[in-house]
A protein has these predicted regions:
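Cationic, low-complexity basic patches in intrinsically disordered or flexible, solvent-exposed regions
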Residues: 3
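Short, extreme N-terminal segment that most often corresponds to the first beta-strand
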Residues: 14-72, 86, 270-277
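N-terminal low-complexity, intrinsically disordered segments
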Residues: 46-117
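Short acidic, S/G/P-rich loop/turn micro-motifs used as interaction or catalytic elements
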Residues: 49-50, 131-135, 225-227
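Structural alpha-beta junctions
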Residues: 61-69, 146-161, 240-249
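Internal, hydrophobic cores of structured domains that mediate oligomerization or house catalytic pockets
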Residues: 88-190
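Aromatic/basic-lined ligand-recognition segments
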Residues: 164-255, 261-277
Length: 277
């Protein structure tokens, strides 16, 4: 198998692109390991961020529709709450009257007819609680966090939702729909909970997949293949990797586009997907 260079980083960037080499240090691979955090950002127009009292009242009035309750409420001017959902604790930060949470960078936007100007919005963050922060990548934590964020996005005047580990921003109803479908057993929502970034050579690299599968993925491009078809294939592979979990040895899989070779890096943090000749 001829392994042509498909990385999005230029060959003279000082990074070793050999899949058999040790993984680069964090920050060396710009696309694969730049994901900033494990929170969900809920963005509001100025003056519309909720207070701790408003969140507590919303949960009390939901009659179980939002499966969460307040377990710790400091003074309201501290601007945060601890919530319990499915036996797991989460923190909601950036509430009024405290300062808004940091918004972060955005690499992809989904679901908007016309996206808002992010610099005009204010964020609150839904984060894994301190007691479970070390397990932020465990499926029960991610699924509960995503479901709770979807409920809040529909019940509050949210203007946009950010999935921090992928640096994506979504229209609230779009976010809620893809999360609900996924939690009901549907395909993993790669267009939102990960970013799929296209290289000049037609390859596609993920950002944020490592939270779900332990590694980022890069799919080799194919000459003459329409970009939409490459994207569909990348979505299939991401769904497979999320369902399969960590891949530690090379393997081949069958797809509608033919057989593919999955080759993990030596450290397991990067997965190359090749198209055997």
């Amino acid at each position: 198998l001829e392994q042509s260079t498909t990385c999005l980083i230029a060959p003279d960037d000082g990074v070793n692109h050999d899949p058999h080499a040790a993984d680069p240090a964090p920050g060396d691979m710009e696309l694969a390991h730049a994901a900033p955090g494990n929170g969900v950002s809920l963005f509001f127009r100025a003056g519309e961020r909720p207070t701790a009292a408003a969140i507590a009242a919303l949960l009390d009035a939901s009659n179980g529709e939002i499966m969460a309750r307040v377990t710790h409420r400091p003074a309201d001017d501290e601007g945060w709450l601890e919530l319990l959902a499915s036996g797991l604790t989460f923190e909601l930060t950036g509430l009024e009257p405290a300062d808004a949470a940091a918004g972060g960078d955005t690499v992809q936007i989904h679901g908007f007819d016309r996206a808002p100007l992010m610099t005009e919005l204010e964020a609150i963050h839904l984060l894994p609680g301190r007691h479970i922060a070390g397990g932020a990548g465990l499926p029960p934590v991610i699924r509960t966090q995503a479901g709770l964020a979807a409920s809040l996005a529909l019940k509050l005047p949210v203007a946009a939702v950010g999935w921090q580990s992928a640096q994506t921003v979504m229209e609230p109803r779009y976010f809620a729909q893809i999360v609900v479908n996924w939690l009901a057993g549907g395909t993993f929502p790669a267009l939102g909970l990960t970013a799929l970034l296209r290289g000049e050579d037609g390859s596609i690299a993920t950002r944020g997949l490592s939270r779900f599968s332990g590694c980022e993925m890069q799919l080799e491009g194919a000459a003459g293949e329409p970009p939409s078809e490459t994207l569909k294939l990348a979505i299939r592979i991401v769904d497979y990797l999320v369902r399969q979990g960590s891949i530690t040895e090379p393997r081949e899989i069958d797809t509608p586009k033919g057989r593919l070779l999955l080759e993990p890096s030596r450290g397991g943090r990067q997965l190359w997907v090749w198209r055997p000749a």
